């Protein structure tokens, strides 16, 4: 049996299934750095180390040992199916007959990085910036498509000592498509504790990354809070409808006329020239901070003091276009909260 084993990105993240697979192996084959990560688990086993770029030779050697009747572990960092040894194994094994194999999944580098950053992943794309095997034009097309679609983007192999062009071109594309304040998570792991930081896209610099780094680029809904990077899914948090909001939507079920309400005694409550069509936000409480709102801690109150989005012309125009399909009166603000939050997300993603 050949077991293609994902050992995870760090020593403490190896799975029980991977441990058992290693225990059942006679021979362990892998890149020298990955072998060091699990060396204490390999007593009494034949261990074969190789260098970077020797992937095909590792597979051929694993098959050779297997045909000798030995159980072989072919180890891969992270998950073997994500830029790991599973892919190259399946390119080679069809040359031979009677090969028994099993793929043992592992914790991927992107999932590990996400766990260190908070909850940055929603719909996301994983893209390697290594152009050793993939044309640079193909990589950049994927970057552009992912950014245009609003996906979170995880970049593997962002920067080599001599391979800098892919990262520079990727950043240029991202900056042309995403707001400069878009959060970017950077997790670098070698042998010790991970180096974790969050910057905005405008500040993303190649001095912060290398080949041991995962870069996670957020989208327009991603925000940061207390050192965590969060991309919300849009769960509906139920709270009672405020009586003033009820009164407003009884009189104005689809909001008031667009534009500033300079006759209001509180105008401007956010900024000069604000659009007052929705004096009371129809999404309250959205309970996610992508537009600046936040919980008043230990009070159970959602504060919109720093959220100006619903008072921008583009937001009002987008919301008015579909709000009538969802609500006909104030009770719908609670009863149809999920549909409302989907509308909010749609308008945010449109920009």
UniProtKB/Swiss-Prot annotation:
Keyword Cytoplasm: no
Keyword annotations from UniProtKB, A to Z: Cobalamin biosynthesis, Methyltransferase, S-adenosyl-L-methionine, Transferase
Metal-binding among keywords: no
Pfam family, one: zf-like
Coiled coil start-end: none
Biological function: May also convert cobalt-precorrin-3 to cobalt-precorrin-4.
Name listed for the protein in its UniProt record: Probable cobalt-factor III C(17)-methyltransferase
Family statement drawn from the similarity comment of this UniProt entry: Belongs to the precorrin methyltransferase family.
Chemical reaction(s) catalysed: Co(II)-factor III + S-adenosyl-L-methionine + H(+) = Co(II)-factor IV + S-adenosyl-L-homocysteine
GO MF entries: methyltransferase activity
Gene name linked to the record: cbiH
